Amino acid sequence: GNKVILSDGPNVFTGCKLTVHMQTGQAELESCGGRVQIQLDPKSQPNAQQQKQN
């Protein structure tokens, strides 16, 4: 299938199926048979919502 790309600032996630739960704001990304590809920026910070939960 077609690849799906999810980005959060400089961080990029690539898979084949993206499910977003609108009520919780959480997203699930499924792979294309192997692993989800992730490119993380080591300098990136968690978003404000994640910081409040910790």
Swiss-Prot record:
The name this protein carries in UniProt is Uncharacterized protein in rpoN-linked probable transport protein 5'region
Organism field = Rhizobium etli
Q: What is the lineage of its organism?
A: Bacteria, Pseudomonadati, Pseudomonadota, Alphaproteobacteria, Hyphomicrobiales
